[in-house]
């Protein structure tokens, strides 16, 4: 393809609302344009990258035995009401009514639709297992869409759904999809890690996230340096360590005027934060609950929500805190907490040790509080966020906390949807059984952005070869030089015959502009044809990733290019 015929509107400056590198570079490279908040148009170059990701996803899904379908984006409310998610999904579900006053939504996911489809078709165990997938546009009405394609409201997603006779079959389907995902992200040239994860609003018993490793990632991972354990910090287990502090003495009330935070109380009383207990108040499915962690720890709200089995968990408002405790925020404690009947504590707090807690009284705390003696704890559980100082829960090794971007998620759904929607089949004995489900998602458009977050430099995008809109940027420095133009056309024809996508820059622009644009759009292989080089019988080749330059002979170019390209691919691990 000739650049002069392409629509590639590159920009020198990024838009002011672009916060992350991928957003800035996707706009500057002319790959996306914003329509409205969280909604983007894919320009020709961006769509080429998106389609290349989708093609690899499609190949590996087909290879794993899944079959492609295409389901409607508009979904009727009655299906969501069957599973109960119409009420609990939240405001991310965009609801609307048609002219006949019937309720619908724009699909953020398709569990209900696919289950309705399969329950109407499958009657016998002989028809199972089934794995159906689609690559389709989704919509989630994010409250704060940001970071371009990383957290938009409209996005392209691959979602697959498996239906099996029993849990053993579901486990096999899960393994097949897990393996397919490893192949997909390896083929894309991404550095990634599969980690144990929380199932969130999708539900189910077990799940893994596939994370692209990037310092700009929104997710934090807990990765053991000694074994294979890896988990999202929301899921990461913390091994309980026995409290060795002395048993509590007599409970005592102490004034703490104006000390609302852990830091302020610690400073006022002259003690370290690990001698205090935080009492955090929440509303779980409309019911007040309290959660306790050590003062220097962070509560893991996902663990608390899972412990409660709650559909919703929200931090109590200042007004609710005062109504339940009789004190303003900052003085809540587990002793005499009459407005909250359910109190949970982290395992680290179990025992007779003396702690400092809020007194449920303004400007007052209690010392020497034993949770065993002085408070009514419903249960002790792992409720805290893992830190780098905590040991691996599997082997006791050291834990690192790298950042990652979620690009894929696989779930064992079990009977969550099939049971509520009565998706059944007749087994070998003619007995009715409920299908066991799994679901498997990949954020196709997010993969493009994540790739750029992981692969960029000061000059622009550094695309891995499988994702690049054009693998080869062929720079013709002087289009008016007939000999150079003829040689460029010859090289272009050879490369295309070899199966490479080639962008021949034949624009009437200064060489400096061409070099800058080639770096910006991120083609992994750059070839430069200039009059001086051709006079010496060479074509300059640049590895976009390493920046290394070499000269390839015009005579024998084919073999020289193949050898050079093999070296570039090796650097990518491809």
Swiss-Prot record:
Keyword Ligase: yes
Its job: Catalyzes the attachment of proline to tRNA(Pro) in a two-step reaction: proline is first activated by ATP to form Pro-AMP and then transferred to the acceptor end of tRNA(Pro). As ProRS can inadvertently accommodate and process non-cognate amino acids such as alanine and cysteine, to avoid such errors it has two additional distinct editing activities against alanine. One activity is designated as 'pretransfer' editing and involves the tRNA(Pro)-independent hydrolysis of activated Ala-AMP.
Entry keyword Ligase: yes
UniProt GO cellular component terms: cytosol
Compartment(s) of residence: Cytoplasm
Similarity section: Belongs to the class-II aminoacyl-tRNA synthetase family. ProS type 1 subfamily.
Protein name: Proline--tRNA ligase
Catalytic class of the enzyme: ligase
Gene3D superfamilies: Anticodon-binding domain, Bira Bifunctional Protein, Domain 2, YbaK/aminoacyl-tRNA synthetase-associated domain
A Gene Ontology molecular function term of the record: proline-tRNA ligase activity
Top-level taxon in the UniProt lineage: Bacteria
Catalyses which reaction(s): tRNA(Pro) + L-proline + ATP = L-prolyl-tRNA(Pro) + AMP + diphosphate
EC number of this enzyme: 6.1.1.15
InterPro entries: aa-tRNA-synt_IIb, aa-tRNA-synth_II, aa-tRNA-synth_II/BPL/LPL, Anticodon-bd, Anticodon-bd_dom_sf, Pro-tRNA-ligase_IIa, Pro-tRNA-synth_IIa_bac-type, Pro-tRNA-Synthase_IIa_type1
Subunit structure: Homodimer.
SUPFAM superfamilies: Class II aaRS ABD-related (SSF52954), Class II aaRS and biotin synthetases (SSF55681), YbaK/ProRS associated domain (SSF55826)
Organism of derivation: Nitratidesulfovibrio vulgaris (strain DP4)
Keyword annotations: Aminoacyl-tRNA synthetase, ATP-binding, Cytoplasm, Ligase, Nucleotide-binding, Protein biosynthesis
